[in-house]
Amino acid sequence: MTTVNLDLQNSLVAEKNRGKITQIIGPVMDISFLPGQMPNIYNCLTVKGKNASGDFIDVTCEVQQLLGDNKVRAVAMSATDGLMRGMEVIDTGSPLSVPVGETTLGRIFNVLGEPVDNLGPVDTSITFPIHRAAPAFTQLDTKLSIFETGIKVVDLLAPYRRGGKIGLFGGAGVGKTVLIMELINNIAKAHGGVSVFGGVGERTREGNDLYMEMKESKVINEENISESKVALVYGQMNEPPGARMRVGLTALTMAEYFRDVNKQDVLLFIDNIFRFVQAGSEVSALLGRMPSAVGYQPTLSTEMGTLQERITSTKEGSITSIQAVYVPADDLTDPAPATTFAHLDATTVLSRNLAAKGIYPAVDPLDSTSTMLQPWIVGEEHYETAQGVKETLQRYKELQDIIAILGLDELSEEDRLIVARARKIERFLSQPFFVAEVFTGSPGKYVSLIDTIKGFQMILSGELDHLPEQAFYLVGDIEEATAKAATIQVQSE
């Protein structure tokens, strides 16, 4: 009897529910099923067949709404060109699932978890569904701890929270990509962690450039792909909104495996979080929802919250997320960036002025913020040093107009000292990157938080007033700066 039941079960699994397309509106389609065979919300549906010219079509879509009358409305994950009414649709019976684990490292995937780098198939023995619940409240790690990056300006003035969310603001050409690659490199070396990069609705050229630069800087190891430190998931600008709306979840799912199963610290990069919202708004009207403020989807906060709540620290491991934020028309009150800000623990703002001076990383020390910079979290010493650095730089900024008009000589003795120290601080905030060794020629430096604090304390106290300011430019810790000063002195003699 049991054998008969098993056979019956197997035949039911093999016999998937089938429906037919009744309407296609751009990336959205309506599909009718037989009574009692309706798919669940978020189920993955596939359309396989031939178009009018005889070419093979394979489109995956995701159920978004149950319309009644045995109809569902679904969003396509790839172009709907060539689809026709009456085509057969198969319900896979489960949400979209993607490969996870070590096999993903060094590879590029699309939203469906298919490799798109022409390096052959990926082992799909372990897959996770992209729609998963956020960790339970009891599993969360409530300790506030700093995530050390080894980058002086970040660790001192706008420290990242382990398992926190960081917004990365900056225009074109100020060094976002290099900063991202350095963070990927440092987490692998210092924390033994891995990274997942989600390219959401950005330029395909940038995605390709990032891949090439990662291979050049050995973040992706071509000789031994399994030794790579990052997995890449791309859903670029040319993809339909369905893919751009879900590619962030695909990347997050891959990151969750490393956190929950491998118990590692993971860095998740999302470039760009605004495009995730934008894709949702493109689909929203087609799904028949009333637009809300500025034409955005009424479900904006829910969609953002569902994604962001899954990015967190548990007692097992952490996902620290760095999200590039595009601000439409530089309007910070726009609903998309405003909703994003509610979730961020820190902001890293890149400045074009610093990049123009040749100070890299071009992180603006006065505009970048962090909720972690509190004396009871980072300690009194770190807090006092950071405040001292900010005060000195702020005073220097105020004095710049006077210097431009009257010159340095017109300043008081005290102000001249502040300017000299501020210029040293500004230069000491720069540092050579491992991933930039190829084009700078100077070896990269990872500076521990203790060394960073010690260095800035010495500059603020006036111990190093006698050293030339160029000794502080592009060095690691303060010992290196004093050694460089000695070399400069010898050369000048």
Curated annotation (Swiss-Prot):
InterPro entries: AAA+_ATPase, ATP-synt_VA_C, ATP_synth_F1_bsu, ATPase_a/bsu_AS, ATPase_alpha/beta_chains, ATPase_F1/V1/A1_a/bsu_N, ATPase_F1/V1/A1_a/bsu_N_sf, ATPase_F1/V1/A1_a/bsu_nucl-bd. It is a peripheral membrane protein. It is found in: Plastid, Chloroplast thylakoid membrane. One of its GO terms (cellular component) is chloroplast thylakoid membrane. It catalyses: ATP + H2O + 4 H(+)(in) = ADP + phosphate + 5 H(+)(out). Its EC number is 7.1.2.2. It comes from the Eukaryota. One of its GO terms (biological process) is proton motive force-driven mitochondrial ATP synthesis. Keywords: ATP synthesis, ATP-binding, CF(1), Chloroplast, Hydrogen ion transport, Ion transport, Membrane, Nucleotide-binding, Plastid, Thylakoid, Translocase, Transport. Produces ATP from ADP in the presence of a proton gradient across the membrane. The catalytic sites are hosted primarily by the beta subunits. F-type ATPases have 2 components, CF(1) - the catalytic core - and CF(0) - the membrane proton channel. CF(1) has five subunits: alpha(3), beta(3), gamma(1), delta(1), epsilon(1). CF(0) has four main subunits: a(1), b(1), b'(1) and c(9-12). Belongs to the ATPase alpha/beta chains family. PANTHER family: ATP SYNTHASE (PTHR15184), ATP SYNTHASE SUBUNIT BETA, MITOCHONDRIAL (PTHR15184:SF71). This is ATP synthase subunit beta, chloroplastic. The gene is atpB.
